[in-house]
Amino acid sequence: DMRENITRRAPVRVIEEFGIRVARPGSDVTIASCGRMLHESLAAAALLENQHGISAEVLDVRILAPLDKKTLLQSVRKTGRFLVVQEECAHGFGAYLVATVADEALEHIQARRILILGTPCAFAPPPRFWHFHVPTASLITAQVHTLVQE
């Protein structure tokens, strides 16, 4: 049996909190991300604050099911603008977050659109092309600046 050959080990760190964590409070725009894109989003939030005076609230989406709608919607209602940053294709977890915001907080959106930054194709590109597709802090900053100016 294959299961007998699998070594089980304790997790390095137990995550006690699930849902969405406000990684950086802000008031002008909500940026939702997870994993590696959280670090790019935090870097972009610092650039936005320092260079443009834009206060970005960054959400760390740690689990989707069940979705922490309360934290997500509270942030979007406060800022009025919403951007999802993800590494995967644009149809990934961001589409679920955008649908939730559109269903339950659309009247609070001040911008003409809600953005998803991610790979614009149905499949992930080969690793040597990732730098063309993965959102960076500068790309996030440019998109948020455009979103706030609308």
Predicted feature locations:
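Thiamine diphosphate
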Residues: 1-150
